Design a protein with these regions (language model features):
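Membrane-interface "cap" regions at the ends of multi-pass membrane proteins
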Residues: 1-38, 227-230
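Membrane-interface alpha-helices at helix entry/exit sites of multi-pass transporters
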Residues: 16-17, 49-56, 84, 88-100, ...
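Extracellular loop-to-transmembrane helix junctions
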Residues: 44-74, 83, 94
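Structural signature of hydrophobic alpha-helical transmembrane segments
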Residues: 56-57, 123-137, 199-207
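Selective recognition of specific alpha-helical transmembrane segments in multi-pass small-molecule
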Residues: 102, 106-110, 160-177, 229-252
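Hydrophobic alpha-helical segments and their helix-loop junctions in multi-pass secondary transporters
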Residues: 110, 114, 118-135, 143-144, ...
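Hydrophobic, small-residue-rich membrane helices and short re-entrant helix-turn-helix hairpins
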Residues: 146-160, 213-247
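Helix-loop-helix junctions that connect adjacent transmembrane segments
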Residues: 157-160, 166-215
């Protein structure tokens, strides 16, 4: 707890900005959650109760552990990203390969996180989806070039609270409105269309159980925590919270 964090020993007012543990937790939750623990569990529910089992086991023993270690490794390496940490230990060639892999992964995830909300907003408003694509890209640009506490630090906590509120509301509906789920429990190893649960359930439900993409996000908040003792609550805890959200959506 007495070891200075990157935000304390090398603040730059841009990426390395000290923020409160609660705010960092909420930002981390929204960073790793988004659409992932919604779409993935809904699709994974086709495999039946095995989806619930995977979310619980995967989240507790794999996903949360992965997020904690990726975040704390970044803290110990002065807020470095995964390619830099890998390169420090395995050499420059592996660093370059990891950087290419991370860029490709981020492009793929970015496309989903642009097309998904834009399509949904287009359906709700009747406006052209490209308008929302342009708005989302404009936000991406501003959030990238401005200090982390100017947009991300102010907007993300609000939307993270909304995400939690939505999940709690759905849980309340399940608990108090008499809805049933998996009333006729049948443990199968395939979906209704015949797709095998192994290995498809593990890649269908990634966010909410275990996602390597989170390793690209954890360093963002590793640069903002003010004490290493908060690492478990922020990195491990945010993944557990995402798992709970995923469980709620699986039951729907």
């Amino acid at each position: 707890p007495n070891r200075p964090t990157p935000a304390c020993k090398m603040p730059d007012g841009v990426d390395y900005v000290e923020m409160s543990p609660t705010k960092v937790f909420l930002i981390q939750l929204l960073n790793i959650a988004g659409l992932g623990p919604v779409f993935g569990p809904i699709l994974g529910a086709l495999y039946g109760p095995i989806a619930l089992l995977w979310v619980v086991i995967g989240c507790v023993f794999a996903g949360a552990v992965h997020d904690y270690f990726s975040g704390m490794l970044s803290v110990r390496y002065n807020g470095k990203s995964v390619p830099d940490i890998v390169g420090y230990n395995l050499g420059d060639l592996i660093k370059k390969l990891m950087r290419v892999f991370a860029v490709v992964l981020l492009i793929l995830v970015g496309v989903v996180f642009v097309a998904g909300p834009a399509g949904l907003l287009s359906q709700l408003t009747g406006m052209h989806s490209m308008l929302f694509v342009a708005i989302i890209f404009a936000y991406y640009f501003l959030a990238t070039i401005l200090p982390v506490d100017k947009i991300i630090g102010r907007v993300y906590p609000f939307f993270a609270v909304l995400l939690v509120f939505m999940a709690v509301g759905l849980l309340g509906a399940l608990a108090f409105k008499g809805y049933t789920f998996y009333s006729n429990i049948e443990w199968t190893m395939h979906s209704p269309s015949g797709l095998p649960a192994w290995p498809l359930v593990f890649i269908t439900i990634a966010c909410g159980a275990c996602s390597g993409f989170h390793a690209t996000q954890s360093p963002l908040m590793a640069r903002c925590i003010n004490n290493e003792k908060h690492g478990r609550k922020i990195f491990y805890g945010a993944m557990i919270a995402e798992g709970v959200i995923g469980l709620i959506w699986v039951t729907l």
